[in-house]
Amino acid sequence: MLRAAIESLAENFSDAVIAPLFWYLLLGPVGICGYKAVNTLDSMIGHRSDRFLAFGMVAARLDDAANFIPARLSGVLLALAAAFVPAARPFAALATMWRDAAKHRSPNAGWPEAAMAGALDLALAGPRRYHGTLVADPWIGVGRARAELPDLRRALALFVLACVIAAGLIVVALILLLEA
């Protein structure tokens, strides 16, 4: 359960924080509204099932495209945040991200999840039961597969600090734009 919470925290850092900011900075209110519409459609109908195949596939591919850059930025921001979180490993976060991100079934979720796995010395994803069916996903990261409460606390610290770093970078960019 803790491992799943850490995976969700990493993926949602990209989907719920960085991607909306990215699209807002790129296209303003239209960008964030468009992104949230695509992301919500993917959540609602972007499933691999007969029922949603026709429309769901389009929603899923649009979401993949919209998250391509934000997911990679998210991984880098989590690795940067790891430099300031006790016992976190920023270089391992980067190495794990480069090595393992493509192992994830999603073309984007692997980037922040791999960065989180490396930073915390955990193995995320891996074999699991999903709706009663065993899913044999590969492991992301080479650390412990069993996450503990201190790991979740450090994951939360990484999440919060990465949000602060992202906000700081936006402020710096805005100041530079206003001075230009």
Can you name each region flagged by the protein language model?
Residues 1-41, 46-180:
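Hydrophobic alpha-helical transmembrane segments
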